[in-house]
UniProtKB/Swiss-Prot annotation:
Annotated catalysed reactions: octanoyl-[ACP] + L-lysyl-[protein] = N(6)-octanoyl-L-lysyl-[protein] + holo-[ACP] + H(+)
Keywords, in A-Z order: Acyltransferase, Cytoplasm, Transferase
EC number(s) per entry: 2.3.1.181
Function of the protein: Catalyzes the transfer of endogenously produced octanoic acid from octanoyl-acyl-carrier-protein onto the lipoyl domains of lipoate-dependent enzymes. Lipoyl-ACP can also act as a substrate although octanoyl-ACP is likely to be the physiological substrate.
Coiled-coil intervals: none
Protein known as: Octanoyltransferase
InterPro entries: aa-tRNA-synth_II/BPL/LPL, BPL_LPL_catalytic, Octanoyltransferase, Octanoyltransferase_CS
GO molecular function list: lipoyl(octanoyl) transferase activity
Length: 214
């Protein structure tokens, strides 16, 4: 069964979060899976494992939203591709650990298409610039994509965020994923000049390859 892809543009975080919860609560075994592709206005989100103290420099212009996904604190804002994966894992025949691995692989494959070598870090969900990547040394090991999920009754929501041309200064206000000193980078800083639409399309293709049975 294919997934319905929705391009939502720039969407308020709180209302999108409520819509994800409502969709997941209302869905049945016959409900079509959906993939939402969007950007958010600036917002910090704090996951279930989060410590509000990891927002060490609060901003009056950027709100903090407590959410029910796994993980710690992160930032969303314009120039970041956010993909929410509303999937029936039972129907796909996978568990959450496998889902995480497949999402990570889709991001790694996408970045490779644009000349950035990236990798997983055990125990720290997300994608990081690898030593094999031809980038300035200060960006080796920097986080370029975040991942956080919630699974309810075998159905997932939340998803991933890939930094393309993001306000990296906002990340300096937090300890990303709870790690003090963790650098965050975007594709533009690494010299990738392709536009958001091109990168988004490629990411979507890799996600569908990994997650949607042919």
């Amino acid at each position: 069964m294919a997934a319905l892809v929705k391009q939502l543009g720039l969407a308020d975080y709180a209302s999108t979060y409520e819509a994800m919860q409502a969709f997941t609560k209302a869905r049945t075994s016959e409900t079509l899976d959906e993939i939402w592709v969007l950007e958010h206005p600036p917002v910090f989100t704090l996951g279930l494992a989060g410590d509000a103290g990891n927002l060490h420099s609060p901003s009056n212009q950027i709100s903090l939203v407590q959410v029910d996904r796994g993980g710690e604190i992160t930032y969303h804002g314009p120039g970041q591709i956010v993909v929410y994966l509303l999937l029936d894992l039972r129907r796909l025949g996978i568990f959450v650990k496998e889902l995480v691995s497949r999402i990570e692989q889709a991001v790694i494959d996408t970045l490779a298409d644009f000349g950035v070598q990236a990798e997983r870090h055990p125990g720290a969900p997300g994608i990081y610039v690898s030593q094999q990547s031809r980038v300035p040394p200060e960006w080796v090991g920097a986080k370029i994509a975040a991942l956080g999920l919630k699974v309810s009754k075998s159905c997932s929501y939340h998803g991933l965020a890939l930094n393309v041309a993001t306000d990296l200064e906002a990340f300096k206000r937090i300890h990303p994923c709870g790690y003090e000193g963790l650098k965050t980078v975007d594709m533009q800083t690494l010299g990738i000049k392709d536009n958001m639409d091109t990168i988004s399309l490629r990411l979507l293709q890799h996600l569908q390859k990994q997650l949607i049975p042919s």
